Every structure is written in structure tokens, then in C-alpha cells.
Amino acid sequence: RGFEVTAFVRGSTAPAAQHVVHKDVLAIEQSDLAGFDAVVDALGFWTPDTLPLHVKTVLHLADLLSGTKTRLLIVGGAGSLYMDAAHTQQLVDQPVFPEQYRPLASAQRDQLEAIRKRSDVQWTFISPAAEFEVSQPRTGQYVLAGEEFTTNAEGKSVVSYADYAVAVVDL
């Protein structure tokens, strides 16, 4: 689409991007993000000792982008989606939610609640479907559904990584 992409990575593995910066997210400075139209927070923290970094890093990025026109797009999780129109019940709190993902989903919910308090940043929290399929091909179809859990005609909540990535760029 003609976008210029810069990837910030904390490890030695370099993704397929035009520009790669090897720097831990908490070491990123405001000058590192100068001139960017958008910053995508797709950080993955999975272990009990790193889960709190979801909140810490999103607030760090928010501080860096405060008062700028740069958009902060945050890759969230389905667990924070609401199960009701009154927004009183979230997927992560449902008995059917897989126990092994509950700590991660709770950390991402905390991340969402932390960024909600920031009116000084242009942010969007993008939750994928409940089934987030890495091996599925791009179909060119996805649904933007707000903050409520939705399913397709077959009663499934599913999106491929590829379609989700397109949705993030389209936003």
C-alpha cells in the first residue's frame, strides 16, 4: 500500500520490515517515534512475571505520544470484549473462557482500562475474534464490531492473523 514500516524489536530476530530498530520498548524515546503516522503496539508478554508489562508499556508509549497526532493502535485480546449491551460482563470472566488464557486476557483488559484513562493520546484498542488463527489464509473479510463479542453465521468468533493485520492497517 506504499506505507513505510519501521519495526522495533527487542531481540536479535529481524522481521520483514523496511527499517528495523533493535531497542526494548521501554528504552524507546519520543524522538524515535517522531514523524510516524501510527504506532502499532503488538507486544507479546506471556509469562506471569511479564504480564504486567502490558500496562507498563502501553502507558510508556502513551506518554511518548501524548499531545501528538500519531495514532496508537493496540493489539488487544478477545477477553476484554463485552458479552452484553450494558457492558457489565466480559468474555474473560465467562466460565467457558479457557483457563490457560485467563491471565493474559486479564492483563490485556488491565491494559485497555489503563489506556481508557488517556484522553491526550489518539488510541484504538483492537480486539481480535476469540479464535485468532495464525495458519488460516487471508480472506479479505473481517468485521469491525465495537466492544461487544460477536459471532459469524455459524456461531463462531474467528479471524486469521492476515485478515486482522489488514483490519489494523485499514483503521
Segments and roles (model prediction):
Residues 1-6, 11, 68-72, 79-171:
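Oxidoreductase cofactor-interface core, primarily capturing Rossmann-like NAD(P)-dependent enzymes
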Residues 12-68:
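NAD(P)H-binding glycine-rich loop region in Rossmannoid oxidoreductase-like domains
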Residues 41, 73-75:
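Short beta-strand segments at enzyme active-site cores
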Residues 45-48, 78-82:
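Short, catalytically relevant binding-site loops at active-site mouths
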